[in-house]
C-alpha cells in the first residue's frame, strides 16, 4: 500500500482532501498538502490533520523525522480527474508528457472535463488534451 493510499481515507474521513505528498530522503521530511472543498485551509485545520496523521504514522510504523501539513497554495496542483472537474472555468497551466504540435506547455481556461480528456481555451482556440498525457497541471492564481 502506498503512503497516499494509507493517508487519503483518513484525511477524507476528517472532511479534507489529500492533494499531494512530498517526501525528502527516506526517514526525513514528510510534507502533506490538504484542501477543503468549501473554503480555505486554516492553521487549526493543519494542526488537526497533523495530530491525527502523527498518530496514524506511529501506528503504521512509518519512518519520518518531521511532518509538515499545509494548504496546496494558490497555484495548487491538479492531479485527479475530480480536481479538474472542480476547477472548470479557472485558468490553469499544464505540461504534457508528449508534445502536441511541438509544444509541451500550455496556459488557458479549463472549459470541459471528460472521462479521459479535458478541453482548454488557449488564446481563443479550444484544444483537447488526454489526461494520461498530462505531466503537471496547476491553477493560475487570481491576484
Swiss-Prot record:
It comes from Nitrosomonas eutropha (strain DSM 101675 / C91 / Nm57). One of its GO terms (biological process) is translation. Signal peptide: none annotated. HAMAP family: RimP. Keywords: Cytoplasm, Ribosome biogenesis. Pfam families: DUF150_C (PF17384), RimP_N (PF02576). It is found in: Cytoplasm. NCBIfam families: PRK00092.2-1. Required for maturation of 30S ribosomal subunits. The keyword Lyase does not apply. This is Ribosome maturation factor RimP. Its main location: cytoplasm. The keyword Cytoplasm applies.
Amino acid at each position: 500500500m502506498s503512503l497516499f493510499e494509507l493517508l487519503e481515507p483518513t484525511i477524507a474521513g476528517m472532511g479534507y482532501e489529500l492533494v499531494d505528498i512530498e517526501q525528502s530522503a527516506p526517514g526525513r521530511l514528510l510534507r502533506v498538502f490538504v484542501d477543503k472543498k468549501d473554503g480555505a485551509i486554516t492553521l487549526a485545520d493543519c494542526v488537526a490533520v497533523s495530530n491525527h496523521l502523527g498518530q496514524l504514522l506511529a501506528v503504521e510504523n512509518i519512518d519520518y523525522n518531521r511532518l509538515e501539513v499545509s494548504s496546496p497554495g494558490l497555484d495548487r496542483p491538479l492531479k485527479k480527474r475530480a480536481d479538474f472537474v472542480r476547477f472548470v472555468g479557472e485558468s490553469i497551466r499544464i505540461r504534457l508528457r508528449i508534445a502536441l504540435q511541438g509544444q509541451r506547455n500550455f496556459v488557458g481556461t479549463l472549459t470541459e472535463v471528460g472521462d479521459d480528456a479535458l478541453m482548454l481555451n488557449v488564446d481563443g482556440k479550444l484544444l483537447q488534451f488526454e489526461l494520461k498525457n498530462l505531466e503537471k497541471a496547476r491553477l493560475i492564481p487570481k491576484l
